[in-house]
């Protein structure tokens, strides 16, 4: 269901006041500021209110039995996004640690640096997202509409994201893949790919901290459990991509996923997602070199960064 249609059916009191409902983000333009070398953050925060946002209302109705993961909560909380520390996108996109599936067990040690993926900006409602062009040929118009300086690193990152989406470079040829620009389009792609609307999303979460990243340190694995009870079925992974608002590259995968409880040397705790690939999955052939095994010979795993999501059947 379209979020705008959904919220139009709700009484004004549900939306947080007696006046006619307004989305959290204005339809009259999206003011962004260029915080670091290549990252966007919204300037305006949502108005103070304890009422659920339109995105939260959509989630509760579309996925009533599925808790909202932290990765999505961050995207619908512009105040938190605006206050996060500046982060270089080069760092957050390359800090990957690979390990063998057999080495993932309670008591094992792993050195990690939790960082956010590509999507640091706020998620848009479908009506707003669909009103903004999303095509390389429209990039000058997009930059003007979103107040992004032409020729900036931010603009180049957006150009790259558009090109990757248009060239369908997200995943292998036998995978369903799609770039999503709104919460509704992400939910619908995941539901269509998994063949059911009875789905849930999970993400890596650092407990008790709002920081955009954590120090690199050694973590002890306290618990490991499969995300789904039956292996071999499709899942949908959504990776954040650098853009002026939240854009995700989503694709199906047959990887095995684990929920991993971690305890850091400094007391930091995390509930992390580990995905293990048994084939020579595209784009990370170096992973096999790092762990010293032949490509595709044994499952190789990595921890999903903050902000990325995994969709599975309930």
Swiss-Prot record:
Top-rank lineage group of the source organism: Eukaryota
Key word Signal present: yes
Tissues and organs where the protein is expressed, per its UniProt entry: Expressed in shoot and panicles.
Coiled coil: none
This protein's UniProt keywords: Signal
Signal peptide start-end: 1-16
PANTHER family: BURP DOMAIN PROTEIN USPL1-LIKE (PTHR31236), BURP DOMAIN-CONTAINING PROTEIN 7 (PTHR31236:SF31)
Protein name as annotated: BURP domain-containing protein 8
Annotated source species: Oryza sativa subsp. japonica
């Amino acid at each position: 269901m379209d979020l705008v249609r959904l919220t139009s059916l709700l009484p004004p009191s549900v939306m947080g006041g007696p006046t006619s409902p307004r989305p959290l983000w204005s339809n009259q333009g999206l003011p962004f500021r260029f915080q670091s070398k290549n990252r966007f953050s919204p300037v305006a925060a949502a108005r103070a209110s304890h009422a659920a946002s339109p995105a939260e209302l959509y989630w509760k109705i579309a996925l009533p039995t599925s808790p909202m993961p932290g990765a999505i909560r961050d995207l619908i909380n512009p105040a938190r996004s605006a206050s996060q520390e500046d982060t270089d996108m080069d760092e957050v996109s390359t800090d990957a640690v690979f390990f063998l599936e057999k080495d993932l067990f309670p008591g094992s040690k792993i050195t990690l640096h939790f960082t956010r993926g590509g999507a640091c900006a706020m998620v848009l409602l479908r009506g707003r997202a669909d009103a903004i062009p999303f095509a390389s040929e429209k990039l000058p118009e997009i930059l003007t509409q979103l107040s992004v300086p032409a020729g900036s690193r931010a603009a180049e990152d957006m150009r790259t994201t558009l090109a990757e989406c248009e060239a369908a470079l997200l995943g292998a040829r036998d995978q369903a893949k799609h770039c999503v620009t709104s919460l509704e389009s992400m939910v619908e792609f995941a539901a269509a790919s998994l063949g059911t609307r009875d789905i849930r999303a999970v993400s890596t979460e650092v407990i008790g901290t709002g920081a955009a990243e954590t120090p690199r340190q050694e973590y002890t694995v306290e618990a490991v459990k499969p995300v789904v009870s039956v292996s071999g079925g499709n899942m949908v992974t959504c990776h954040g991509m650098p853009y002026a608002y939240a854009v995700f590259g989503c694709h199906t995968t047959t990887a095995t996923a684990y929920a991993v409880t971690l305890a850091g040397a400094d007391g930091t705790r995390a509930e992390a997602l580990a995905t293990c690939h048994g084939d020579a999955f595209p784009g990370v052939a170096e992973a096999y070199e790092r762990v010293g095994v032949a490509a595709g010979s044994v499952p190789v795993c990595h921890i999903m960064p903050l902000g990325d999501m995994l969709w599975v059947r309930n």
